């Protein structure tokens, strides 16, 4: 396959590029300081909580629609199936997985790979688009009389019908990885493994059929490209939009920019914006705007990006809180600030003024906004 890299700037000699996508996931909640009516959001928020439940919050009314009790203890991580019909939930020990029917709000199944004194923890989980199997990164911890023996990370295919490991997938070049970012093509026929290079596997026998060689110079003097986590809700299927950073060793500085990845064509469209800062990043549903969250001790800012003209529009200081994450609502007019605790702050996306706060009856461990079906064609 041919490789593409579209850049809207002149590449400096010996420029090292490092890209990481920063994405950044009962009693009725109380809402304080309700402001004037705005365009209604129509998504659904799924919050795993220390109560041992998945709380379902309606964006339009900001009311709790219900709770799904977890059978595996405190849920801490939620992964949606490709068609959004299932939730794959992991517990706080990362030993147990529960599969939940999203529409019926019922548990379908649970499983663990732990046996006896050997604990097997699942550090990465990705379902295939047809919900027939999971790709897992596992590690075994065995308790001896005086110590724990920690086994190597293992990449496996777990069959959901037989509830058994179908195969162990060899690590590229036999080199173990502590984690593996895995993405499937929309039809499920290809699996992309993110790393130093992007390895492309067919999913019948999981043999490598192609690779996106990121270590090759993109043009004379250019360096390599690395991907971090890619947000499945940021773009249409097969595309991923995020904030990238570029390291310039000659000037000893990092430059950030907006990038859009098309995996099928092995293409990155990258647009530099300015000096890099560590930011959380969230794309508005119309993909015309994106927002960054800068946080440092006593310094918190909202950043606004124009995705049509690839530029930074504004930086707005706000009060913030010590631990926080950000997400744009499904209407694109509000920004959620959340993370530790039981509150979600809503900020106006135009003025960045605090509009109101939603207070839940339990502290959250994860936050996932499921956009309405119009965000994902065919759903």
Residue ranges and their predicted role:
Residues 19-379:
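Predominantly soluble domains enriched in secretory-pathway, periplasmic, or organellar proteins
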């Amino acid at each position: 396959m041919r490789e593409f890299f579209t850049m809207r700037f002149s590449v400096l000699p010996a420029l090292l590029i490092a890209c990481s996508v920063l994405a950044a996931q009962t009693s009725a909640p109380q809402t304080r300081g309700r402001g004037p009516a705005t365009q209604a959001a129509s998504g659904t928020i799924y919050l795993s909580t220390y109560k041992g439940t998945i709380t379902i919050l309606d964006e339009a009314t900001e009311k709790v629609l219900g709770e799904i009790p977890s059978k595996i203890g405190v849920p801490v991580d939620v992964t949606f199936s490709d068609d959004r019909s299932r939730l794959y939930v992991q517990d706080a020990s990362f030993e147990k997985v529960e599969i939940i029917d999203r529409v019926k709000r019922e548990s379908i199944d649970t499983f663990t790979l732990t046996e006896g004194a050997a604990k097997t923890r699942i550090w990465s989980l990705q379902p295939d688009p047809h919900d027939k199997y999971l790709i897992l990164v596992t590690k075994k911890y065995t308790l001896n009389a005086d110590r724990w023996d920690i086994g190597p990370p293992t990449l496996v295919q777990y069959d959901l019908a037989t509830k058994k490991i179908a195969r162990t997938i060899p690590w590229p070049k036999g080199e173990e990885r502590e984690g593996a970012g895995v993405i499937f093509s929309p039809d499920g026929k290809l699996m992309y493994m993110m790393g130093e290079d992007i390895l492309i596997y067919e999913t019948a026998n999981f043999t490598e059929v192609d690779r996106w060689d990121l270590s090759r110079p993109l043009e004379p003097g250019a360096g390599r490209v690395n991907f971090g986590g890619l947000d499945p809700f940021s773009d249409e299927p097969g595309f991923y939009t995020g904030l990238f950073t570029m390291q310039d060793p000659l000037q000893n500085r990092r430059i950030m920019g907006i990038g859009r990845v098309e995996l099928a064509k092995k293409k990155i469209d990258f647009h530099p914006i300015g000096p890099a800062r560590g930011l959380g990043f969230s794309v508005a549903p119309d993909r015309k705007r994106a927002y960054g969250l800068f946080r440092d001790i006593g310094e918190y800012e909202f950043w606004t990006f124009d995705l049509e003209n690839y530029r930074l529009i504004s930086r707005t200081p706000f009060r913030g809180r010590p631990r926080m994450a950000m997400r744009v609502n499904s209407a694109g007019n509000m920004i959620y600030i959340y993370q530790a605790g039981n509150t979600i702050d809503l900020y106006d996306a135009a003025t960045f003024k605090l509009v109101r706060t939603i207070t839940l009856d339990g502290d959250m461990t994860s936050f996932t906004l499921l956009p309405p079906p119009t965000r994902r064609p065919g759903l």
